[in-house]
Amino acid sequence: MASHALLRGVPVALVDGTNRFDAYYIAEFARKVTSQRLVKQRVPPEQLLRQIYVARAFTCYQMEATITERLPAFLRNAGAPIAIIFGLLDTFYDEQAPLFEVQASVGRIITALHRLKADNIAVLLASLDMKLESKERNRLFPRVSSAMDHVLEAVESESGYHFIKEMPGHPDLITETGRMH
Protein backbone atom coordinates (compact mmCIF):
# COMPACT_ATOMS: atom_id res chain seq x y z
CA MET A 1 0.00 0.00 0.00
CA ALA A 2 2.57 2.57 1.11
CA SER A 3 5.17 1.66 -1.50
CA HIS A 4 2.69 2.03 -4.37
CA ALA A 5 1.48 5.35 -2.96
CA LEU A 6 5.02 6.66 -2.59
CA LEU A 7 5.88 5.67 -6.16
CA ARG A 8 2.85 7.66 -7.36
CA GLY A 9 3.95 10.71 -5.36
CA VAL A 10 1.31 10.34 -2.65
CA PRO A 11 2.41 11.51 0.82
CA VAL A 12 2.33 9.02 3.69
CA ALA A 13 2.21 9.74 7.42
CA LEU A 14 4.05 7.28 9.64
CA VAL A 15 3.72 7.10 13.43
CA ASP A 16 6.45 5.06 15.08
CA GLY A 17 5.80 3.71 18.56
CA THR A 18 8.70 1.27 18.32
CA ASN A 19 11.47 3.75 17.51
CA ARG A 20 12.66 1.30 14.86
CA PHE A 21 11.60 2.91 11.58
CA ASP A 22 14.59 2.83 9.25
CA ALA A 23 14.64 5.46 6.50
CA TYR A 24 17.45 3.54 4.80
CA TYR A 25 14.92 0.82 3.96
CA ILE A 26 12.98 3.35 1.86
CA ALA A 27 16.16 4.37 0.05
CA GLU A 28 16.97 0.72 -0.61
CA PHE A 29 13.41 0.15 -1.87
CA ALA A 30 13.82 3.03 -4.34
CA ARG A 31 17.10 1.58 -5.62
CA LYS A 32 15.56 -1.88 -5.94
CA VAL A 33 12.48 -0.85 -7.95
CA THR A 34 14.69 1.27 -10.21
CA SER A 35 17.29 -1.47 -10.76
CA GLN A 36 14.64 -4.10 -11.47
CA ARG A 37 12.89 -1.68 -13.85
CA LEU A 38 9.62 -2.05 -11.95
CA VAL A 39 8.93 1.62 -12.67
CA LYS A 40 9.17 3.56 -15.94
CA GLN A 41 11.73 6.05 -14.71
CA ARG A 42 14.38 6.23 -12.01
CA VAL A 43 13.01 6.98 -8.55
CA PRO A 44 15.53 8.92 -6.49
CA PRO A 45 15.48 7.81 -2.84
CA GLU A 46 15.26 11.48 -1.79
CA GLN A 47 11.95 11.77 -3.66
CA LEU A 48 10.38 8.97 -1.63
CA LEU A 49 11.86 10.21 1.63
CA ARG A 50 10.38 13.69 1.07
CA GLN A 51 6.92 12.11 0.87
CA ILE A 52 7.13 10.31 4.24
CA TYR A 53 6.33 12.25 7.38
CA VAL A 54 7.46 10.51 10.56
CA ALA A 55 6.26 11.15 14.11
CA ARG A 56 7.72 9.19 17.00
CA ALA A 57 5.98 8.50 20.29
CA PHE A 58 8.04 7.47 23.31
CA THR A 59 5.23 7.30 25.88
CA CYS A 60 1.61 6.19 25.79
CA TYR A 61 0.57 9.80 26.38
CA GLN A 62 2.54 10.95 23.34
CA MET A 63 1.04 8.13 21.27
CA GLU A 64 -2.49 9.12 22.23
CA ALA A 65 -1.88 12.81 21.48
CA THR A 66 -0.28 11.93 18.15
CA ILE A 67 -3.12 9.65 17.01
CA THR A 68 -6.07 11.64 18.36
CA GLU A 69 -4.90 15.21 17.72
CA ARG A 70 -1.77 15.67 15.62
CA LEU A 71 -2.25 12.93 13.02
CA PRO A 72 -5.77 13.93 11.89
CA ALA A 73 -4.73 17.59 11.60
CA PHE A 74 -1.57 16.68 9.70
CA LEU A 75 -3.37 14.37 7.28
CA ARG A 76 -5.91 17.08 6.54
CA ASN A 77 -3.31 19.81 6.00
CA ALA A 78 -0.90 17.66 3.97
CA GLY A 79 -3.61 15.95 1.93
CA ALA A 80 -2.07 12.61 2.87
CA PRO A 81 -4.56 9.74 2.42
CA ILE A 82 -2.46 7.07 4.14
CA ALA A 83 -1.31 6.64 7.74
CA ILE A 84 0.91 3.82 8.94
CA ILE A 85 1.29 3.21 12.66
CA PHE A 86 4.08 0.98 13.93
CA GLY A 87 3.82 -0.38 17.46
CA LEU A 88 0.61 1.36 18.47
CA LEU A 89 0.50 -0.47 21.80
CA ASP A 90 4.21 -0.77 22.59
CA THR A 91 4.23 2.31 24.82
CA PHE A 92 1.01 1.20 26.55
CA TYR A 93 2.72 -1.90 27.92
CA ASP A 94 4.78 0.28 30.28
CA GLU A 95 3.67 -0.58 33.81
CA GLN A 96 4.44 3.00 34.92
CA ALA A 97 1.22 4.16 33.24
CA PRO A 98 -1.85 3.41 35.38
CA LEU A 99 -4.06 0.75 33.80
CA PHE A 100 -7.25 2.83 33.98
CA GLU A 101 -5.51 5.62 32.02
CA VAL A 102 -4.16 3.15 29.49
CA GLN A 103 -7.59 1.58 28.90
CA ALA A 104 -9.27 4.98 28.49
CA SER A 105 -6.53 6.13 26.15
CA VAL A 106 -6.83 3.03 23.96
CA GLY A 107 -10.57 3.67 23.71
CA ARG A 108 -9.96 7.24 22.53
CA ILE A 109 -7.42 6.01 19.99
CA ILE A 110 -9.87 3.45 18.58
CA THR A 111 -12.46 6.23 18.21
CA ALA A 112 -9.91 8.43 16.43
CA LEU A 113 -8.97 5.58 14.05
CA HIS A 114 -12.64 5.09 13.18
CA ARG A 115 -12.91 8.83 12.45
CA LEU A 116 -9.92 8.60 10.11
CA LYS A 117 -11.62 5.74 8.28
CA ALA A 118 -14.80 7.82 7.99
CA ASP A 119 -12.63 10.56 6.43
CA ASN A 120 -11.41 8.05 3.80
CA ILE A 121 -7.93 7.74 5.28
CA ALA A 122 -6.32 4.33 4.81
CA VAL A 123 -4.75 3.25 8.10
CA LEU A 124 -2.35 0.35 8.52
CA LEU A 125 -1.43 -0.74 12.04
CA ALA A 126 1.64 -2.95 12.33
CA SER A 127 2.01 -4.41 15.81
CA LEU A 128 3.33 -7.40 17.64
CA ASP A 129 0.95 -9.42 19.78
CA MET A 130 3.18 -9.55 22.84
CA LYS A 131 2.63 -11.81 25.81
CA LEU A 132 3.07 -9.81 28.99
CA GLU A 133 2.99 -10.69 32.67
CA SER A 134 0.01 -8.38 33.15
CA LYS A 135 -3.23 -10.15 32.16
CA GLU A 136 -4.98 -6.79 31.89
CA ARG A 137 -2.42 -5.36 29.46
CA ASN A 138 -2.53 -8.60 27.45
CA ARG A 139 -6.14 -7.68 26.65
CA LEU A 140 -5.13 -4.47 24.86
CA PHE A 141 -4.10 -6.14 21.59
CA PRO A 142 -7.32 -8.18 21.23
CA ARG A 143 -9.32 -5.03 22.05
CA VAL A 144 -7.64 -3.05 19.28
CA SER A 145 -7.69 -5.89 16.74
CA SER A 146 -11.39 -6.58 17.35
CA ALA A 147 -12.12 -2.94 16.45
CA MET A 148 -10.34 -3.20 13.08
CA ASP A 149 -11.87 -4.11 9.73
CA HIS A 150 -9.13 -6.58 8.81
CA VAL A 151 -6.47 -8.32 10.86
CA LEU A 152 -3.60 -10.15 9.18
CA GLU A 153 -0.99 -12.21 10.94
CA ALA A 154 2.38 -12.61 9.22
CA VAL A 155 3.61 -16.17 9.66
CA GLU A 156 7.12 -17.20 8.69
CA SER A 157 7.66 -20.53 6.95
CA GLU A 158 10.44 -22.13 4.93
CA SER A 159 9.08 -20.58 1.73
CA GLY A 160 8.90 -17.05 3.15
CA TYR A 161 6.16 -15.15 4.91
CA HIS A 162 2.47 -15.70 4.37
CA PHE A 163 -0.48 -13.89 5.81
CA ILE A 164 -3.31 -15.36 7.80
CA LYS A 165 -6.49 -13.31 7.85
CA GLU A 166 -8.35 -13.32 11.14
CA MET A 167 -11.89 -12.06 11.38
CA PRO A 168 -11.96 -9.29 14.02
CA GLY A 169 -13.93 -10.39 17.04
CA HIS A 170 -13.81 -13.98 15.76
CA PRO A 171 -10.24 -15.30 16.18
CA ASP A 172 -11.46 -18.80 15.35
CA LEU A 173 -12.33 -17.73 11.76
CA ILE A 174 -9.02 -17.71 9.88
CA THR A 175 -8.20 -17.86 6.17
CA GLU A 176 -4.86 -17.82 4.36
CA THR A 177 -4.56 -14.69 2.22
CA GLY A 178 -1.25 -14.77 0.41
CA ARG A 179 2.47 -15.26 0.46
CA MET A 180 5.37 -12.85 0.60
CA HIS A 181 8.88 -14.03 -0.25
Where is each model-derived feature located?
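Conserved P-loop
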Residues: 1-65
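Conserved catalytic network of the ASCE P-loop NTPase/AAA+ motor domain
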Residues: 4-7, 44-47, 74-78, 115-119
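Localized chelating/binding microdomains
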Residues: 6, 29-33, 39-44, 90, ...
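Loop/turn-to-beta-strand initiation segments
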Residues: 11, 51, 79-83, 118-128
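Short, ordered loop/turn segments at secondary-structure junctions
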Residues: 17-19, 88, 128-129
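A short acidic (Asp/Glu
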Residues: 24-26, 95-97, 135-137
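Phosphate-binding/switch loop-helix module in NTP-utilizing enzymes
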Residues: 58-115
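Phosphate-binding/switch region of NTP-binding enzymes
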Residues: 114-181
